Swiss-Prot record:
It comes from Bacillus subtilis (strain 168). Forms polymers. InterPro entries: YuaB-like, YuaB-like_sf. Induction: Up-regulated by DegU and Spo0A. Repressed by AbrB. This is Biofilm-surface layer protein A.
Amino acid sequence: MKRKLLSSLAISALSLGLLVSAPTASFAAESTSTKAHTESTMRTQSTASLFATITGASKTEWSFSDIELTYRPNTLLSLGVMEFTLPSGFTANTKDTLNGNALRTTQILNNGKTVRVPLALDLLGAGEFKLKLNNKTLPAAGTYTFRAENKSLSIGNKFYAEASIDVAKRSTPPTQPCGCN
């Protein structure tokens, strides 16, 4: 019985190794037809990417707007935790969405600074995660950097990515609530 279990585990491990190494070898070929064309024809292990965009009407400080973060781990195989880290001035809540579904309180950590997806699967770089921060007050003018990371059992190159947004300065300062200067 023990021998049968060990042999089936060995076969499973070998199969997984072949599954992972076969696409890597077949896609990693370099193009050498001309000197001008020196880039790879296909890349299996491209780095992770994150795109951050202010999708609302205003991009100026102290106004309300939506922010959309699109993360692609671009791994061959990954299973585990996906995590977004928000910069100072931004927080997530249950009115925000991940891939069109409202965030649950269990996905929001560190007082809204971290959004964690507990079980995420990316196979052959097909995974895409869209975090939409809805109706946020944009902080003071400046550049803000967001980070997304695949913290899991992964096979690939680079598992995190960063992207920045620029919040513009208001043309006129906001009025004081008391009407005083």
